[in-house]
Amino acid sequence: MVNDVLREAESRMKKATEALRNHLATIRTGRASPALVEHLHVEAYGATLPLNQLATITVPEPRMLVIQPFDANTVKAISKAIMNSELGITPTDDGRLIRLAIPQLTEARRKELTKLVRARVEESKVALRNIRREALEDLRDLEHEKMISEDEHRRAQEKLQELTDRYVRELDHIGATKEAEVMEI
């Protein structure tokens, strides 16, 4: 029972950490990365599809993304989706390939992105604390129902705190890495 509560908490913490990683991957740095655009939604074939289902995205140079649609008829729709996104990048297309030149970030934009990274990390920490609180409530319920002893409850609380601390350190590391990436010129 205690192990089930701890396993569930760890699983949810892992998901929160992955969600942060995925979200931070979409934040633009001075470097080109397919993660910047792969989840953009494109109106094609009468539906809205993620870009990575319509094209291959490559990085031929550190500041260049090349998008090669599987179907040349989707080039205009993909360009439109990129223009409508908040990336601030203008696509150039030759009818079959789309090139995205990633401009250098200004100092003000870097600081703005750093604040955004910190805010996302803090939101994830709040999510971890909420997961911990819910797990603590579950453990308390088990103790009140006499399914576990007070000692087992205390040991489980300590394990849960260690788990939370480990994931908070991981979130801090992910955030620091992304901040360094954003501030890199």
UniProtKB/Swiss-Prot annotation:
Gene Ontology molecular function: ribosomal large subunit binding
CDD domains: RRF (cd00520)
Entries under Pfam families matching the protein: RRF (PF01765)
Transmembrane segments annotated in the record for this chain: none
GO terms of biological process kind: translational termination
GO cellular component: cytoplasm
Keyword Cytoplasm attached: yes
InterPro entries to which the protein is assigned, alphabetical: Ribosome_recyc_fac, Ribosome_recyc_fac_dom, RRF_sf
Source superkingdom: Bacteria
Keywords from the UniProt entry: Cytoplasm, Protein biosynthesis
Subcellular localization(s) per the UniProt record: Cytoplasm
Entry annotated with the keyword Cytoplasm: yes
Predominant location category: cytoplasm
HAMAP family for the chain: RRF
Homology family: Belongs to the RRF family.
Primary role: Responsible for the release of ribosomes from messenger RNA at the termination of protein biosynthesis. May increase the efficiency of translation by recycling ribosomes from one round of translation to another.
Name recorded for this polypeptide: Ribosome-recycling factor
Species of provenance: Roseiflexus castenholzii (strain DSM 13941 / HLO8)
